Protein backbone atom coordinates (compact mmCIF):
# COMPACT_ATOMS: atom_id res chain seq x y z
CA UNK A 1 0.00 0.00 0.00
CA UNK A 2 1.22 3.54 -0.74
CA UNK A 3 2.97 5.36 2.08
CA UNK A 4 1.01 7.81 4.19
CA UNK A 5 3.07 10.63 2.68
CA UNK A 6 1.83 9.77 -0.82
CA UNK A 7 -1.79 9.84 0.34
CA UNK A 8 -1.61 13.57 0.95
CA UNK A 9 1.08 14.62 -1.55
CA UNK A 10 0.08 16.84 -4.47
CA UNK A 11 -0.40 14.84 -7.69
CA UNK A 12 1.05 11.65 -6.15
CA UNK A 13 0.45 8.27 -7.78
CA UNK A 14 -1.43 5.65 -5.77
CA UNK A 15 -1.59 1.92 -6.39
CA UNK A 16 -4.84 0.35 -7.58
CA UNK A 17 -5.14 -1.47 -4.28
CA UNK A 18 -4.83 1.78 -2.33
CA UNK A 19 -7.38 3.51 -4.55
CA UNK A 20 -9.84 0.67 -4.02
CA UNK A 21 -9.32 0.76 -0.26
CA UNK A 22 -9.88 4.53 -0.08
CA UNK A 23 -12.97 4.24 -2.28
CA UNK A 24 -14.49 1.58 -0.01
CA UNK A 25 -13.55 3.66 3.02
CA UNK A 26 -15.40 6.64 1.55
CA UNK A 27 -18.60 4.63 1.10
CA UNK A 28 -18.30 3.21 4.63
CA UNK A 29 -17.85 6.70 6.07
CA UNK A 30 -20.91 7.94 4.19
CA UNK A 31 -22.98 5.02 5.46
CA UNK A 32 -21.68 5.54 9.00
CA UNK A 33 -22.54 9.25 9.00
CA UNK A 34 -26.00 8.43 7.66
CA UNK A 35 -26.56 5.85 10.42
CA UNK A 36 -25.29 8.25 13.10
CA UNK A 37 -27.59 11.09 11.99
CA UNK A 38 -30.66 8.85 11.94
CA UNK A 39 -29.79 6.99 15.16
CA UNK A 40 -29.81 10.25 17.13
CA UNK A 41 -32.60 11.74 14.97
CA UNK A 42 -30.63 14.90 14.23
CA UNK A 43 -32.82 15.09 11.12
CA UNK A 44 -36.53 14.26 11.11
CA UNK A 45 -36.86 10.51 10.27
CA UNK A 46 -39.60 11.40 7.78
CA UNK A 47 -37.04 13.45 5.84
CA UNK A 48 -34.08 11.09 6.29
CA UNK A 49 -35.02 7.51 7.26
CA UNK A 50 -32.43 5.14 8.68
CA UNK A 51 -30.26 2.91 6.45
CA UNK A 52 -31.98 -0.14 7.94
CA UNK A 53 -35.40 1.15 6.93
CA UNK A 54 -34.25 2.15 3.44
CA UNK A 55 -32.53 -1.13 2.63
CA UNK A 56 -35.35 -3.06 4.28
CA UNK A 57 -37.84 -1.45 1.89
CA UNK A 58 -36.36 -3.40 -1.04
CA UNK A 59 -38.25 -6.48 0.19
CA UNK A 60 -41.53 -4.58 -0.12
CA UNK A 61 -40.59 -3.17 -3.52
CA UNK A 62 -39.72 -6.64 -4.79
CA UNK A 63 -42.82 -8.36 -3.46
CA UNK A 64 -45.47 -5.68 -3.90
CA UNK A 65 -44.19 -3.27 -6.57
CA UNK A 66 -42.64 -5.69 -9.09
CA UNK A 67 -39.28 -3.96 -8.76
CA UNK A 68 -37.44 -6.18 -11.26
CA UNK A 69 -39.92 -5.49 -14.07
CA UNK A 70 -39.91 -1.77 -13.20
CA UNK A 71 -36.11 -1.75 -13.51
CA UNK A 72 -36.38 -3.44 -16.90
CA UNK A 73 -38.97 -0.87 -18.02
CA UNK A 74 -36.76 2.08 -17.04
CA UNK A 75 -33.54 0.62 -18.44
CA UNK A 76 -35.24 -0.16 -21.77
CA UNK A 77 -36.47 3.43 -22.07
CA UNK A 78 -33.01 4.68 -21.15
CA UNK A 79 -31.21 2.52 -23.71
CA UNK A 80 -33.68 3.08 -26.55
CA UNK A 81 -33.79 6.84 -26.03
CA UNK A 82 -30.04 7.12 -25.62
CA UNK A 83 -29.18 5.00 -28.64
CA UNK A 84 -31.61 6.98 -30.79
CA UNK A 85 -30.10 10.28 -29.67
CA UNK A 86 -26.54 9.09 -30.37
CA UNK A 87 -27.42 7.61 -33.78
CA UNK A 88 -29.00 10.90 -34.89
CA UNK A 89 -26.50 13.27 -33.25
CA UNK A 90 -23.30 11.74 -34.66
CA UNK A 91 -23.98 12.02 -38.43
CA UNK A 92 -25.81 15.33 -38.04
CA UNK A 93 -22.97 16.67 -35.90
CA UNK A 94 -20.40 15.77 -38.54
CA UNK A 95 -22.47 17.44 -41.27
CA UNK A 96 -22.85 20.64 -39.26
CA UNK A 97 -19.28 20.63 -37.96
CA UNK A 98 -17.53 19.93 -41.27
CA UNK A 99 -19.68 21.64 -43.91
CA UNK A 100 -19.57 25.46 -43.59
CA UNK A 101 -23.00 26.06 -45.14
CA UNK A 102 -24.85 23.90 -42.62
CA UNK A 103 -22.72 25.18 -39.74
CA UNK A 104 -23.63 28.80 -40.39
CA UNK A 105 -27.22 27.88 -41.21
CA UNK A 106 -28.20 26.28 -37.90
CA UNK A 107 -25.32 26.30 -35.38
CA UNK A 108 -26.72 29.26 -33.44
CA UNK A 109 -30.19 27.73 -33.30
CA UNK A 110 -28.70 24.51 -31.91
CA UNK A 111 -26.87 26.45 -29.21
CA UNK A 112 -30.07 28.25 -28.26
CA UNK A 113 -32.07 25.01 -28.15
CA UNK A 114 -30.02 23.80 -25.17
CA UNK A 115 -31.94 26.28 -23.01
CA UNK A 116 -35.27 24.63 -23.80
CA UNK A 117 -37.14 23.88 -20.52
CA UNK A 118 -37.90 20.22 -21.23
CA UNK A 119 -40.70 19.76 -18.66
CA UNK A 120 -42.59 22.54 -20.43
CA UNK A 121 -42.52 20.59 -23.71
CA UNK A 122 -44.39 17.54 -22.42
CA UNK A 123 -47.73 18.63 -23.87
CA UNK A 124 -46.12 19.07 -27.30
CA UNK A 125 -44.62 15.58 -27.18
CA UNK A 126 -47.95 14.08 -26.11
CA UNK A 127 -49.67 15.79 -29.04
CA UNK A 128 -47.08 14.44 -31.50
CA UNK A 129 -46.34 10.94 -30.16
CA UNK A 130 -49.49 10.05 -28.24
CA UNK A 131 -49.35 8.64 -24.71
CA UNK A 132 -47.62 5.27 -25.16
CA UNK A 133 -44.09 4.02 -24.61
CA UNK A 134 -42.83 5.83 -27.72
CA UNK A 135 -43.69 9.16 -26.06
CA UNK A 136 -41.25 8.47 -23.23
CA UNK A 137 -38.49 7.28 -25.57
CA UNK A 138 -38.81 10.31 -27.85
CA UNK A 139 -38.89 12.73 -24.91
CA UNK A 140 -35.72 11.20 -23.47
CA UNK A 141 -33.99 11.06 -26.86
CA UNK A 142 -34.75 14.73 -27.50
CA UNK A 143 -33.43 15.79 -24.10
CA UNK A 144 -30.13 13.95 -24.66
CA UNK A 145 -29.86 15.03 -28.30
CA UNK A 146 -29.92 18.71 -27.31
CA UNK A 147 -26.63 18.20 -25.47
CA UNK A 148 -24.95 15.63 -27.72
CA UNK A 149 -25.23 17.62 -30.95
CA UNK A 150 -23.37 20.75 -29.74
CA UNK A 151 -20.84 18.46 -28.02
CA UNK A 152 -19.81 16.69 -31.21
CA UNK A 153 -19.54 19.99 -33.09
CA UNK A 154 -17.30 21.26 -30.30
CA UNK A 155 -15.07 18.16 -30.58
CA UNK A 156 -14.70 18.81 -34.31
CA UNK A 157 -13.61 22.37 -33.54
CA UNK A 158 -11.06 21.10 -31.00
CA UNK A 159 -9.21 18.90 -33.46
CA UNK A 160 -8.78 21.91 -35.74
CA UNK A 161 -6.66 23.59 -33.07
CA UNK A 162 -4.64 20.52 -32.03
CA UNK A 163 -1.12 20.90 -33.46
CA UNK A 164 -0.49 17.15 -33.75
CA UNK A 165 -3.81 16.48 -35.47
CA UNK A 166 -3.33 19.43 -37.80
CA UNK A 167 0.00 17.93 -38.85
CA UNK A 168 -1.66 14.55 -39.47
CA UNK A 169 -4.37 16.23 -41.52
CA UNK A 170 -1.83 18.15 -43.59
CA UNK A 171 0.09 14.94 -44.26
CA UNK A 172 -3.07 13.25 -45.55
CA UNK A 173 -3.81 16.24 -47.77
CA UNK A 174 -0.25 16.08 -49.13
CA UNK A 175 -0.79 12.38 -49.92
CA UNK A 176 -3.94 13.33 -51.89
CA UNK A 177 -6.35 11.54 -49.57
CA UNK A 178 -9.94 11.62 -50.83
CA UNK A 179 -12.69 13.28 -48.75
CA UNK A 180 -13.95 9.83 -47.72
CA UNK A 181 -10.44 8.74 -46.69
CA UNK A 182 -10.04 11.95 -44.69
CA UNK A 183 -13.30 11.29 -42.90
CA UNK A 184 -12.71 7.57 -42.31
CA UNK A 185 -9.09 7.74 -41.18
CA UNK A 186 -8.85 11.21 -39.65
CA UNK A 187 -12.10 12.90 -38.66
CA UNK A 188 -14.08 9.86 -37.48
CA UNK A 189 -11.47 8.39 -35.09
CA UNK A 190 -10.20 11.78 -33.90
CA UNK A 191 -13.64 13.21 -33.16
CA UNK A 192 -15.39 10.10 -31.85
CA UNK A 193 -12.55 9.28 -29.44
CA UNK A 194 -13.01 12.73 -27.89
CA UNK A 195 -16.80 12.60 -28.13
CA UNK A 196 -17.26 9.26 -26.35
CA UNK A 197 -16.63 10.74 -22.87
CA UNK A 198 -19.52 13.14 -23.57
CA UNK A 199 -21.75 10.14 -24.25
CA UNK A 200 -20.64 8.60 -20.94
CA UNK A 201 -21.17 11.79 -18.92
CA UNK A 202 -24.67 12.34 -20.27
CA UNK A 203 -25.82 8.96 -18.95
CA UNK A 204 -26.32 10.72 -15.60
CA UNK A 205 -28.45 13.41 -17.25
CA UNK A 206 -30.54 10.76 -19.00
CA UNK A 207 -31.70 9.32 -15.67
CA UNK A 208 -32.91 12.76 -14.61
CA UNK A 209 -35.07 12.93 -17.73
CA UNK A 210 -36.34 9.38 -17.27
CA UNK A 211 -38.07 10.33 -14.02
CA UNK A 212 -39.89 13.09 -15.92
CA UNK A 213 -40.63 10.87 -18.93
CA UNK A 214 -42.15 8.08 -16.85
CA UNK A 215 -44.66 10.45 -15.30
CA UNK A 216 -46.13 11.16 -18.74
CA UNK A 217 -49.18 8.89 -18.74
CA UNK A 218 -47.45 6.86 -16.02
CA UNK A 219 -47.47 3.13 -16.72
CA UNK A 220 -44.45 1.92 -14.78
CA UNK A 221 -40.75 2.37 -14.18
CA UNK A 222 -38.57 3.58 -11.33
CA UNK A 223 -39.69 7.19 -11.77
CA UNK A 224 -43.29 6.06 -11.44
CA UNK A 225 -42.45 4.19 -8.22
CA UNK A 226 -40.89 7.36 -6.82
CA UNK A 227 -44.06 9.25 -7.70
CA UNK A 228 -46.24 6.67 -5.92
CA UNK A 229 -44.06 6.71 -2.81
CA UNK A 230 -44.03 10.52 -2.52
CA UNK A 231 -47.68 10.94 -3.47
CA UNK A 232 -48.85 8.92 -0.47
CA UNK A 233 -46.47 10.67 1.94
CA UNK A 234 -45.92 7.44 3.86
CA UNK A 235 -43.09 5.62 2.08
CA UNK A 236 -40.19 8.07 1.96
CA UNK A 237 -37.78 5.17 2.61
CA UNK A 238 -38.81 3.70 -0.76
CA UNK A 239 -37.86 6.96 -2.46
CA UNK A 240 -34.34 6.72 -1.05
CA UNK A 241 -34.15 3.03 -1.97
CA UNK A 242 -35.10 3.74 -5.59
CA UNK A 243 -32.69 6.68 -5.83
CA UNK A 244 -29.87 4.45 -4.57
CA UNK A 245 -30.88 1.84 -7.14
CA UNK A 246 -30.81 4.40 -9.97
CA UNK A 247 -27.34 5.53 -8.85
CA UNK A 248 -26.17 1.90 -8.85
CA UNK A 249 -27.54 1.32 -12.36
CA UNK A 250 -25.83 4.51 -13.51
CA UNK A 251 -22.50 3.36 -12.03
CA UNK A 252 -22.80 0.04 -13.87
CA UNK A 253 -23.61 1.81 -17.15
CA UNK A 254 -20.67 4.16 -16.60
CA UNK A 255 -18.31 1.22 -16.03
CA UNK A 256 -19.54 -0.65 -19.12
CA UNK A 257 -19.30 2.42 -21.36
CA UNK A 258 -15.78 3.20 -20.15
CA UNK A 259 -14.80 -0.40 -20.92
CA UNK A 260 -16.30 0.03 -24.40
CA UNK A 261 -14.36 3.28 -24.81
CA UNK A 262 -11.10 1.48 -24.01
CA UNK A 263 -11.96 -1.25 -26.51
CA UNK A 264 -13.05 1.03 -29.37
CA UNK A 265 -10.31 3.64 -28.98
CA UNK A 266 -7.28 1.69 -27.80
CA UNK A 267 -4.92 4.35 -29.18
CA UNK A 268 -6.08 6.76 -26.45
CA UNK A 269 -4.73 4.46 -23.77
CA UNK A 270 -1.56 3.27 -25.53
Walk through the language-model features, giving the residues of each.
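Transmembrane alpha-helical segments of polytopic membrane transport and secretion proteins
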Residues: 1-25, 255-270
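N-terminal signal-anchor transmembrane alpha helix
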Residues: 14-42
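Short membrane-interfacial helix/loop motifs at transmembrane-helix boundaries
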Residues: 33-63
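Transmembrane alpha-helix signature in integral membrane proteins
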Residues: 64-95
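Loop-to-helix entry region at the N-terminal start of transmembrane alpha-helices
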Residues: 69-77, 127-149, 238-243
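Cytoplasmic-entry segments and transmembrane alpha-helices of multi-pass inner-membrane transporters
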Residues: 88-127, 151-158, 162
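Membrane-cytosol interface at the C-terminal ends of specific transmembrane alpha-helices
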Residues: 133-202
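C-terminal transmembrane helix and the adjacent membrane-cytosol boundary/short C-terminal tail
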Residues: 197, 239-270
Amino acid sequence: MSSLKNLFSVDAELSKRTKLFISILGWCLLLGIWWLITAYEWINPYILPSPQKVFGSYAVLLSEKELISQIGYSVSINLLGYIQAVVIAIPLGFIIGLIPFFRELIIKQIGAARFTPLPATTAIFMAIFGVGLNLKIQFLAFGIFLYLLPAIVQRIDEIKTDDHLRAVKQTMITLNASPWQMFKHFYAPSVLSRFFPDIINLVAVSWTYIVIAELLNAQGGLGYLIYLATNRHTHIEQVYAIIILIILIGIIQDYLLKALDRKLFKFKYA
